[in-house]
Amino acid sequence: MCVCECVCACVCMCERACVCVCVCVYVCVCVCVCVCVCVCVCVVNCLDRHVHTCPERVALIWERDEPGTEVKITYRQLLELTCRLGNLLKRQGVRRGDCVTLYMPSCPLAVASMLACARIGAAHNVVFAGFSSEALADRIRDAQSSTVITVNQGVRGGKVVDLKRTVDQAVQNCPSVQQVLVAMRTENTVAMTDRDVPLEEEMMKEDVVCEPVAMDSEDVLFLLYTSGSTGKPKGLVHTQAGYLLYTSLTHRYVFNYHDGDVFGCVADIGWITGHSYIVYGPLCNGGTTVLFESTPLYPDPGRYWEMVERLGINQFYGAPTAIRLLLKYGDECVQKYNRSSLKTLGSVGEPINTEAWEWYHRVVGDGRCPVVDTWWQTETGGICIAPRPSEPEAEIIPGMAMRPFYGIKPALLDTEGEVLSSNDSTGALCISQAWPGMARTIHNHHQRFTETYFQPYPGYFFTGDGAYRSKEGYYQIIGRLDDVINVSGHRLGTAELEDVVNQCPGVAESAAIGYSHDIKGEGVYVFVVLKKAAEVQEDVLARQLREMVSRSIAKYACPDFIQVVRHLPKTRSGKIMRRVLRKIVEGNTDELGDLSTLDDPDCVREVIRGHQRLRGDGKQQ
């Protein structure tokens, strides 16, 4: 008998009749998710049913790296492309239950490849096209893929990236790979081997009709690898019905999406945000979704907002790290473009600090667009906590995710595993009942799945994040629990500290970490990136920031060291690599580990030199 409630998720949106029977699928001994086992097809809900009603509606707008060269793909065209690819995959020996690895930039062929896999009953494993060959090989081997799909080269920020070369290096260590399908993003030729298949040439030989395979609701839709605390990536498994239901509902209600809107999520499809809110959620809703291939600074810091004006984007969904980056360049880069089409602004990937939130709302949204600071994870499949949906004029508090989505029941637990039932409490963020979009397991490692997410707090799904529940019952994410600094017995969330530091007029963004301290247990070390036009002496800045932290939090929270850096070490998806900063501060620079995912590896050397100078003079401590 399962002690938690079940969520019934029936995804029978297609026009076909199907017989559904509800069963409980046990994810662990005390958490189950109730779904409808039915004969329905995920890809039919994303394509076929819309082709029946609105074949010429634009499904995808490919915002290519080159500004002003966007390509629009209708639902009819996307279905034909998907069917040709599905038939090609079948000709290459891909069958139901296989897993196809994709190493591609954000482009229509990548979306069609994902949908083609779903159409023939294969799972897809999209790997961000910025990972190294070693990281790609690890994911191919774990997924046991016999087929890889890639492009000759990627184009991003005006630079050409040799993706095919990376795949060639990776598959040398992947004996399972039998064929690599190669599409042409640029006109540059690449070396082809007997294993390689020219994708466009072979695809055009295929028929435009490919009957979809009927799938059960709990059949695998895709694998997506995410970082684990042990360092080995986790191949999280998402399934057909519950995932599609959850992404479509959250897309529609969190962003107040309506038919005819243009949805602009600027994430990469290699991450869960791209899967859920570029591909599956918008397409299931019959929406028009933007594929952004470039960077926020190419060719200039106005790229996002020029795109908003040109494409008439109604909902914009981006990362706080990009917002903080653009904030450095001032308001003019935003205000010279017409953004009247915008109705909702979204934030994803990490907690957004108050200053960035207010700039986003005031400057980008002209003070009229609600900002939805969304909290969720690869594991959750879709948004779990956000300011919307709610009453139209309901309060939105800067920097807070606020309200659980339908069916999500958050719980805060203390270090003893006791539920904190009162408001004005801080604890480990858990979820007390199952929901349709949750991952079902880790590929080939179900024991690791249960140990990671269910054993820490039996009866609850453990998110790994800490959260604060306000007196009003609203939720604020305070950061990963491994990002909590314990100063003299006081728990200090890095997100809370960074939020204060980032309110300094000269600061663009910051990263706070803990380091070993002989007396306090842990001290506080803060890295600061200044705004482009800021001119301030470091000792004056340090004094100012300490005063702000003392006022806003407490004296114990004051940083021991404040180091000004030009850039923070980040992954290509924009996440700060805090483990690298911790190693530098602890003096373990020979143990930095794999830096292949860094966007700018040179910045690490600059951080090391600056740290050595700062600790060498001993002025701040």
Protein language model annotation of sequence segments:
Residues 182-183, 519, 551-576, 588-618:
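AMP-binding/adenylate-forming catalytic domain of the ANL superfamily
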